[in-house]
């Protein structure tokens, strides 16, 4: 549940990287870093203890995003977890939902791998033979790899497959969003 790091890469309209955001977060609920998380990410307990709390980092992140943005994620859970944490800290009003986003994992599965099963980010990086210059499982590194994969996917086709995160459900019938894709409707 508890987010301990936010990392993102900002792309311009030509998909050129123009900025990065990377911050660790001092945990409030699970104050002791689990050894598996430590081993997977390389984040240390000392680093987390010296970090700002979620509310500070989130406000900085949303300011960094600006007004005109769309999230690109690897999978469909990043926005759910972000909003769960925002709700816990009373900050959900900073992100109006339902949220439109690009699920790059879905794009890769449908447009490149032609497979219905989930695929790891590292597998997609390998598929495109991208250089592995940084470790996986750090937020900003994974964001950079996701952006690299996104750049190599047919943008016109991908943008037809955008996703809507429904963590925040429409409040009335007029706010409902209905999507029709080539192979399904929601």
How would you describe each model-predicted region?
Residues 24, 96-111:
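A short, structured active-site edge motif that brings together acidic residues
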Residues 85-89, 127, 152-156:
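Active-site catalytic microenvironments for nucleophilic, acid-base chemistry
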Residues 1-84, 126:
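Conserved non-catalytic scaffold segment of RNase H-like nuclease domains
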Residues 77-100:
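Substrate-recognition/cap helix-loop segment adjacent to the acidic, metal-dependent catalytic center
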Residues 139-149:
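Alpha-helical transmembrane segments that form the membrane-embedded catalytic/substrate-binding core
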Residues 32-34, 38-41, 45-48, 107-141:
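Active-site-proximal helix-loop-helix substrate-binding element of RNase H-like nuclease domains
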Residues 69-73, 92, 132-137:
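Short helix-to-loop capping/linker segments positioned immediately adjacent to catalytic or ligand/cofactor-binding
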Residues 147-186:
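Acidic two-metal-ion nuclease catalytic site recognized across multiple nuclease folds
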């Amino acid at each position: 549940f508890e987010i301990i790091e936010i990392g993102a890469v900002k792309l311009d309209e030509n998909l050129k990287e123009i900025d990065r955001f990377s911050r660790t977060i001092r945990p409030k609920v699970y104050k002791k870093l689990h050894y598996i998380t430590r081993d997977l990410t390389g984040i240390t307990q000392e680093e987390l203890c010296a970090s700002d709390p979620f509310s500070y980092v989130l406000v900085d992140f949303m300011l960094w995003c600006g007004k005109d943005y769309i999230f690109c994620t690897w999978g469909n859970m990043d926005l759910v977890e972000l909003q769960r944490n925002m709700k816990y800290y009373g900050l959900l009003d900073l992100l109006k939902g339902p949220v439109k986003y690009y699920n790059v994992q879905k794009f890769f599965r449908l447009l490149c791998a032609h497979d219905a099963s989930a695929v790891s980010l590292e597998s997609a990086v390998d598929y495109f033979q991208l250089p592995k210059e940084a470790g996986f499982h750090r937020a900003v590194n994974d964001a950079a790899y996701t952006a690299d994969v996104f750049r190599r996917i047919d943008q016109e086709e991908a943008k037809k497959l955008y996703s809507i995160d429904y963590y925040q459900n429409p409040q009335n019938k007029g706010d409902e969003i209905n999507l029709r894709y080539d192979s399904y409707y929601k």
